[in-house]
Regions:
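Glycine/proline-rich loop-helix segments at beta-alpha junctions forming the active-site rim
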Residues: 1-29, 169-265
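Low-complexity, serine/threonine/proline-enriched polar segments
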Residues: 118-191
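Active-site and ligand/interface coordination hotspots across diverse enzymes
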Residues: 1-150, 216-220
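Short linear motifs at secondary-structure transitions and domain/linker junctions
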Residues: 72-78, 160-162, 204-206, 242
Length: 265
């Protein structure tokens, strides 16, 4: 810090020298792609059943904490639904210009279950699976598909993000939909779907998948200085998850919404 105060190194360089819990490390895009734990369940994201109780859409290393959490919660509104695809992020956080940080995907039976079961077998359901699979692997180019899948893809999420982003989209009428949605990605604090968020895990433990998300944000903060962050939910939880150097490097780039503007998602 003395070098920083003396003006011999920049504030950013000073932050770079702070250590996190495991010591300072640089997270590269190559490392993220190689160590992406979601690759291990990529095979589940094929077929046509976007609601499938015969599948468990969860990382093996996350299951103990999730199963323990679900078994200890009497109120099923808090249970994580593993019969629908997990979504740690939507869009491509490695290429987006604005990263939306939220809490976890919401569950609504008429959307996540009923609409999923009504999707025609074939191109639509398989195409949506492909979009979600490619998103898991950082291989999509936008926040949502810009083709005939658009309507059904959004209905599965109760059109939530389409509605919220429409206010911004209307402000830039000169930008076509494809270009607009390429600028956004959503990263969830927890990848698993629930009707209501039921709190953290026992002993304040983090899921292994959350620790990978932590590394993902570290990469974005230090390798993508142009990226802005919009924290819609769980501000304090994100602050606790991220290392101090990452959080304080993010602060000037955080866009703050109005209080409770997006509280119900």
């Amino acid at each position: 810090f003395s070098l920083c105060k003396a003006g011999k190194i920049s504030v950013e360089e000073c932050l770079n020298k702070l250590t996190h819990a495991n010591g300072w490390c640089d997270v590269s895009e190559d490392w993220l792609r190689e160590n992406n734990p979601w690759q291990s369940i990529e095979s589940l994201y094929y077929g046509y059943k976007l609601y499938d109780p015969s599948k468990t859409f969860a990382l093996q290393e996350d299951l103990n904490l999730i199963n323990s959490f679900n078994s200890n919660k009497q109120n099923r509104e808090f249970h994580y639904h593993l019969e629908v695809p997990a979504e740690p992020w939507q869009g491509n956080p490695l290429t987006a210009n604005i990263i939306i940080l939220s809490l976890n995907p919401g569950w609504k039976e008429e959307c996540n279950k009923d609409h999923a079961l009504q999707l025609p077998v074939g191109r639509v359901s398989e195409g949506i699976f492909a979009e979600k699979r490619n998103s898991l692997l950082f291989n999509v180019h936008g926040f949502m598909p810009q083709d005939s899948l658009f309507e059904d893809f959004n209905k599965l999420g109760d059109n939530y993000w389409e509605k919220r982003l429409s206010y911004i989209k209307e402000a830039v009428p000169e930008m076509d939909s494809s270009e607009f949605y390429q600028k956004f990605a959503l990263v969830q604090y927890c990848a698993y779907t629930s009707e209501k968020y039921g709190g953290g895990f026992k002993n304040n433990a983090y899921l292994p998948s959350q620790l990978f998300t932590k590394d993902l944000i570290r990469h974005i903060v230090y390798h993508r200085p142009d990226v802005k962050f919009l924290i819609l939910r769980a501000h304090d939880k994100w602050k606790a998850l991220l290392d101090n150097d990452v959080w304080y490097a993010m602060l000037p780039r955080i866009i703050s919404p109005k209080p409770n503007q997006y509280r119900n998602q």
